[in-house]
C-alpha cells in the first residue's frame, strides 16, 4: 500500500450515521438532565452469553478439583513475560483478589468482587491497581480452559484464596456464584475528584477523619483503602490508624479483622518501587492498542522482576515472603523503625538495625538481601493502642492469628455475595455466620388461600396492607444482595423503629398479621407479602380488573439472635420516592435519590414508573399525604395517576419548595397537589413516554398487569431459593 495514501487529510471519514466517540451527547448539552442510564446499564443485549444462560447451572459441570490443581500449578509456573517474585505468584494473586473484594463498602453495598468489575474502568486503571492487569492476564489460560463454567469474578477471588493455600494457610472455605458483568458500572460513585490521588480533603467534611464522605470507603480517589505512605502521603501512623478504622469499618470489619487482614495481606509478597514511577506508561484504559489491554509500561531495566514499579514503595515485609507464618508480627514488633525513601521516592519505614539473615532475599538472586519495609498502615498496628494489643496477641498465637485471618479473608471475599443461599460449590462452610444475615427455612405446606381469606376479612385497609409489604421488601439492594422481605426483619430491631417504616402504623398492622400467621402456620414473612398481594387484588377488582398476584411460599422468619443490628443500620431508608417520602432535605434532588434506590432494587425505568403510578392511587404515601394521588378513586388500582398527569386541562404551579398545585386551567380550582418527584414523570421526556403508554385508553389492563409484575419482582428480589 502506498504510504502517502494513508496519511490523515484532516477530514473525518465517518459518515456520522451513528455516534461512537465523536460529537456532543445529550449530557453535554443538558448536564443537569435526569440520567436514567444507571437503570439499564446491564441490559441483556450486552451479555454475550445470552438471556437463557444460567451460570448456576454451568457451575454444576465445573471440575472444581481440576481447577484448583491448575491454580496451584500456576502459582509456581513463572512466565518470562512477567516473572513471579521468588518464583511464586502468590503475592500478586492475593493483591488482585484483595483489591477486587476490597472496593466493597457497606453504606450502599456497591463495589466488591462479586461482578468481576476489576476488568473494566475505572478499577482496571486505578493507581492502586498497577500490575493487576498482569495478574488477570496470567489467569487467562485457565479462564479460557474452563470457559463459561467459570466467571472472571469467581476466578479472581479463588486465585487469591488458592494462593494462600499454596503458601501454607488453611483457608476457611470458598463459594462460587459470582456472575460477571460486561461493561463498567455506571451506578457506583467513587468520588467527585477529577485527578487520581487528589488531596483527601476533597472527600472529608472536616479535619475529623471520621467525616469521610458517604458512601465512600477509600481515603483518596484511586486507592482501595488508605494511603500506604500516610494521610495524603505524609507519614503519621496514628493518623493513618484513624483512616484504617474508618475505611475498614465501612467494609464491615472490626479492629481485630482489620489487624488480621492488614497483617495477613502483608505476610506474603512485596511492594514494588525499584524505579521511577513517573516513567510508567499509560494505564490500561488509555494505553495504545498494541498494548492489548495492558498498561503501565515500564522502560526501566527489564521493566519487570526486580525493576517492577507499582505503589512506589519497595521491599518485602517478612523474611520468607512466599510462606504463611508469623513473620510479619515478629518483624514489626521486634525492631525499631525509621522513615526512609524507596528508590522511587516513596516514604516507607525500614528497620534501624536488622540481622542479615532476617532480611528478605532479592526476587531474582537469592544471594542478595535487602531491608524489609513497612507501610504507614503497618506501623499503625504497632503504635495505635488497640491495634497494638491485637497485634501482640497474634504474635504470641500463630494458630489464633491464622484462624482469625482465614475467617476475615472469607468475609472480605464473600461479603458482597449476600445470603448463603447464593453460595455454590463443595467448599462452602457449613457454619452460618451472622454477617450472612441468616434466615431459617420457611414452610410451604400451609393453606395460602386460607391466609389470604383471613387477611381480606381483617380490619386492615388496602393502603396498610400494601405499604407494610412494600416497606418490608424495599430494603433489598442488588449491590450486595442484602435486605428484602425474607426473614420478616421489619418486625425486629432496628427496622421496627425506623422512621421510614412509620413505627406506630407498623406495630398496629403487625399485631393483626402475626396473629393470622400463628393461626394458619404461615411465616410472618409470607403473611406480610400476602397482605400486600391481597391489597392489590382488592384494588384491581375495584378498578374493574380481575387479577391474581403470583406468590411463592417459603419465606422464613429470622430472630433477634440472627440479626446484627449495627449491620442493618446501613439499610435504613432515608428517602423513598415510591411512598413520596424524604426524611429531611438533601443536597441531591429527589429524582436522583429515586434513581439510586430504584437501581439498588434492580428495577428498570419502566418498572419504576408503573410502580409509582400504582402506589400513588393506592394511597400508600408516607403519613397518608395526598401529594401525587391524582385520582378520585383512591384505593382502586387505576391508571388515573398517568391520565391526569398528562391531561392538558390542568396546569402545574409551585406553591412551596418542591411542592406544586394542580389547577384547572379554566377555573383555577386546585384539584390536587404534587411533589417535584410526581411531576418528573411528566417532565422528563423518557419517563413521560412511559407515562403516556399507561395513560392510554387501551392500557388499563396493561397497567395493572405491569404493576403486578413489577410488584412481584420486588417481593421476590431476595428469594434466591427460587433460582434453584
Curated annotation (Swiss-Prot):
<keyword id="KW-0560">Oxidoreductase</keyword>
<dbReference type="Pfam" id="PF00141">
    <property type="entry name" value="peroxidase"/>
</dbReference>
<feature type="active site" description="Proton acceptor">
    <location>
        <position position="99"/>
    </location>
</feature>
<keyword id="KW-0408">Iron</keyword>
<feature type="site" description="Transition state stabilizer">
    <location>
        <position position="95"/>
    </location>
</feature>
<dbReference type="GO" id="GO:0005829">
    <property type="term" value="C:cytosol"/>
</dbReference>
<protein>
    <recommendedName>
        <fullName>Catalase-peroxidase</fullName>
        <ecNumber>1.11.1.21</ecNumber>
    </recommendedName>
</protein>
<keyword id="KW-0575">Peroxidase</keyword>
<keyword id="KW-0376">Hydrogen peroxide</keyword>
<keyword id="KW-0349">Heme</keyword>
<dbReference type="InterPro" id="IPR000763">
    <property type="entry name" value="Catalase_peroxidase"/>
</dbReference>
<dbReference type="GO" id="GO:0046872">
    <property type="term" value="F:metal ion binding"/>
</dbReference>
<dbReference type="GO" id="GO:0020037">
    <property type="term" value="F:heme binding"/>
</dbReference>
<feature type="binding site" description="axial binding residue">
    <location>
        <position position="266"/>
    </location>
    <ligand>
        <name>heme b</name>
    </ligand>
</feature>
<feature type="cross-link" description="Tryptophyl-tyrosyl-methioninium (Tyr-Met) (with W-98)">
    <location>
        <begin position="225"/>
        <end position="251"/>
    </location>
</feature>
<comment type="function">
    <text>Bifunctional enzyme with both catalase and broad-spectrum peroxidase activity.</text>
</comment>
<dbReference type="GO" id="GO:0042744">
    <property type="term" value="P:hydrogen peroxide catabolic process"/>
</dbReference>
<dbReference type="GO" id="GO:0070301">
    <property type="term" value="P:cellular response to hydrogen peroxide"/>
</dbReference>
<feature type="cross-link" description="Tryptophyl-tyrosyl-methioninium (Trp-Tyr) (with M-251)">
    <location>
        <begin position="98"/>
        <end position="225"/>
    </location>
</feature>
<dbReference type="GO" id="GO:0004096">
    <property type="term" value="F:catalase activity"/>
</dbReference>
<comment type="similarity">
    <text>Belongs to the peroxidase family. Peroxidase/catalase subfamily.</text>
</comment>
<comment type="subunit">
    <text>Homodimer or homotetramer.</text>
</comment>
<dbReference type="InterPro" id="IPR010255">
    <property type="entry name" value="Haem_peroxidase_sf"/>
</dbReference>
<keyword id="KW-0479">Metal-binding</keyword>
<feature type="region of interest" description="Disordered">
    <location>
        <begin position="1"/>
        <end position="26"/>
    </location>
</feature>
<dbReference type="InterPro" id="IPR019794">
    <property type="entry name" value="Peroxidases_AS"/>
</dbReference>
<dbReference type="InterPro" id="IPR002016">
    <property type="entry name" value="Haem_peroxidase"/>
</dbReference>
Amino acid at each position: 500500500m502506498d504510504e502517502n495514501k494513508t496519511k490523515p487529510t484532516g477530514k473525518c471519514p465517518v459518515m456520522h450515521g451513528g455516534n461512537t466517540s465523536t460529537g456532543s451527547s445529550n449530557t453535554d448539552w443538558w448536564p443537569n438532565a435526569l440520567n436514567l442510564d444507571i437503570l439499564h446499564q446491564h441490559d441483556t443485549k450486552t451479555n454475550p452469553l445470552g438471556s437463557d444462560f444460567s451460570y448456576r447451572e454451568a457451575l454444576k459441570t465445573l471440575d472444581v478439583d481440576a481447577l484448583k490443581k491448575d491454580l496451584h500449578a500456576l502459582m509456581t509456573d513463572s512466565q518470562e513475560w512477567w516473572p513471579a517474585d521468588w518464583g511464586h505468584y502468590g503475592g500478586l494473586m492475593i493483591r488482585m483478589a484483595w483489591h477486587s473484594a476490597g472496593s466493597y463498602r457497606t453504606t450502599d453495598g456497591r463495589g466488591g468482587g462479586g461482578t468481576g468489575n476489576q476488568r473494566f474502568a475505572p478499577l482496571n486503571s486505578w493507581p492502586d491497581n498497577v500490575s493487576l492487569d498482569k495478574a488477570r492476564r496470567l489467569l487467562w489460560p485457565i479462564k479460557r480452559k474452563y470457559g463459561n463454567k467459570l466467571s472472571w469474578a469467581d476466578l479472581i477471588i479463588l486465585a487469591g484464596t488458592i494462593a494462600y493455600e499454596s503458601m501454607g494457610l488453611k483457608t476457611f472455605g470458598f463459594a462460587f456464584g459470582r456472575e460477571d458483568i460486561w461493561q463498567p458500572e455506571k451506578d457506583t460513585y467513587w468520588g467527585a475528584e477529577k485527578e487520581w490521588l487528589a488531596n483527601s480533603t476533597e472527600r472529608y467534611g472536616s479535619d475529623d477523619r471520621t467525616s469521610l464522605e458517604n458512601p465512600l470507603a477509600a481515603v483518596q480517589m484511586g486507592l482501595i483503602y488508605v494511603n500506604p505512605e500516610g494521610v495524603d502521603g505524609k507519614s503519621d501512623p496514628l493518623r493513618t490508624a484513624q483512616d484504617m478504622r474508618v475505611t475498614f469499618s465501612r467494609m464491615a470489619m472490626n479492629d481485630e479483622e482489620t489487624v488480621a487482614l492488614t497483617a495477613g495481606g502483608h505476610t506474603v509478597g512485596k511492594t514494588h518501587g525499584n524505579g521511577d514511577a513517573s516513567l510508567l506508561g499509560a494505564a490500561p484504559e488509555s494505553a495504545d492498542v498494541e498494548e492489548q489491554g495492558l498498561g503501565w509500561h515500564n522502560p526501566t531495566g527489564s521493566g519487570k522482576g526486580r525493576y517492577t514499579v507499582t505503589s512506589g514503595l519497595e521491599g518485602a515485609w517478612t523474611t520468607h515472603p512466599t510462606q504463611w507464618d508469623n513473620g510479619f508480627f515478629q518483624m514489626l514488633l521486634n525492631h525499631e523503625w525509621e522513615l526512609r525513601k524507596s528508590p522511587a521516592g516513596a516514604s516507607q519505614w525500614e528497620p534501624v538495625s536488622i540481622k542479615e539473615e532476617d532480611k528478605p532475599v532479592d526476587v531474582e538472586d537469592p544471594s542478595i538481601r535487602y531491608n524489609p519495609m513497612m507501610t504507614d498502615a503497618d506501623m499503625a498496628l504497632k503504635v495505635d493502642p488497640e491495634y497494638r494489643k491485637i497485634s501482640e496477641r497474634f504474635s504470641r498465637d500463630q494458630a489464633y492469628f491464622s484462624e482469625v485471618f482465614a475467617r476475615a479473608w472469607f468475609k472480605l471475599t464473600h461479603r458482597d455475595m449476600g445470603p448463603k443461599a447464593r453460595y455454590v460449590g463443595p467448599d462452602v462452610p457449613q457454619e452460618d455466620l451472622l454477617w450472612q444475615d441468616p434466615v431459617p427455612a420457611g414452610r410451604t405446606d400451609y393453606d395460602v388461600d386460607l391466609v389470604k381469606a383471613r387477611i381480606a376479612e381483617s380490619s386492615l385497609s388496602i393502603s396498610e396492607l400494601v405499604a407494610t409489604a412494600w416497606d418490608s421488601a424495599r430494603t433489598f439492594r442488588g449491590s450486595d444482595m442484602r435486605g428484602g422481605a425474607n426473614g420478616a426483619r421489619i418486625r425486629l430491631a432496628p427496622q421496627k423503629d425506623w422512621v421510614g417504616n412509620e413505627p406506630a402504623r407498623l406495630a398496629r398492622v403487625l399485631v393483626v398479621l402475626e396473629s393470622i400467621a400463628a393461626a394458619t402456620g404461615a411465616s410472618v414473612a409470607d403473611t406480610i407479602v400476602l397482605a400486600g398481594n391481597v391489597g392489590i387484588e382488592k384494588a384491581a377488582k375495584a378498578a374493574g380488573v380481575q387479577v391474581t398476584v403470583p406468590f411463592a411460599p417459603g419465606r422464613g422468619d429470622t430472630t433477634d439472635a440472627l440479626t446484627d443490628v449495627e449491620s442493618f443500620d446501613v439499610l435504613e431508608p432515608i428517602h423513598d420516592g415510591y411512598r413520596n417520602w424524604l426524611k429531611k432535605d438533601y443536597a441531591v434532588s429527589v429524582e436522583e435519590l429515586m434513581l439510586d434506590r430504584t437501581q439498588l432494587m434492580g428495577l428498570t425505568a419502566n418498572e419504576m414508573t408503573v410502580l409509582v403510578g400504582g402506589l400513588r392511587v393506592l394511597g400508600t404515601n408516607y403519613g397518608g399525604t395526598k401529594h401525587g394521588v391524582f385520582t378520585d378513586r383512591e384505593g382502586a388500582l387505576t391508571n388515573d395517576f398517568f391520565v391526569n398527569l398528562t391531561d392538558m386541562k390542568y396546569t402545574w404551579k409551585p406553591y412551596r419548595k418542591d411542592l406544586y398545585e394542580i389547577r384547572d386551567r379554566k377555573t383555577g380550582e386546585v384539584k390536587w397537589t404534587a411533589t417535584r418527584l410526581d411531576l418528573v414523570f411528566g417532565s422528563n421526556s423518557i419517563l413521560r413516554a412511559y407515562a403516556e403508554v399507561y395513560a392510554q385508553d387501551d392500557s388499563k389492563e396493561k397497567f395493572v398487569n405491569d404493576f403486578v409484575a413489577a410488584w412481584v419482582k420486588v417481593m421476590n428480589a431476595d428469594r434466591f431459593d427460587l433460582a434453584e
